[in-house]
Design a protein with these regions (language model features):
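Membrane-interface helix-loop junctions in multi-pass transporters/channels
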Residues: 1-130
Length: 130
């Protein structure tokens, strides 16, 4: 059973992450062409990098409390990244007959987020062992 402090940490992190996602998504989407959902891709790549970085810190240090870990990972980064939006945007591209763009979106999100999580993890591992 989670403590009320952990639940509050997740909720407050989620609030900040959701607002940050909306802001960054709008900022990225405004600056780039609208043929591909770059805003969603951007927040997913960014969030995956920081999740990897945090996982390394969580594994190799004891600096973070359970509430801090929950705030940052499940709350903030969980709300910043968005699998459901990625899925619906890919579906809409397919329904619109944009098979190449849908395939590109799916590939960039799937491969890109794993790459960014791995990159973040190795940066975090390097930083904790320096």
């Amino acid at each position: 059973m989670m403590s009320w402090q952990t639940i509050l940490a997740i909720g407050s992190g989620g609030f900040i992450g959701a607002v940050l996602r909306a802001y960054l998504n709008g900022l990225i989407s405004h600056k780039l062409p609208h043929d591909l959902p770059y805003g969603t891709l951007g927040v997913n790549l960014l969030g995956s990098f920081f999740m990897g970085l945090l996982m390394a810190y969580f594994m190799y240090t004891s600096v973070f409390s359970i509430q801090a870990k929950s705030f940052l990972s499940t709350g903030l980064l969980g709300a910043l990244t968005t699998y459901s939006t990625f899925a619906i945007e890919s579906l809409l591209l397919l329904q619109g007959g944009h098979v190449f763009l849908a395939t590109a979106n799916i590939t960039l999100n799937a491969v890109g987020t794993v790459f960014m999580a791995g990159s973040g993890f190795y940066v975090g591992k390097f930083l904790t062992h320096s």
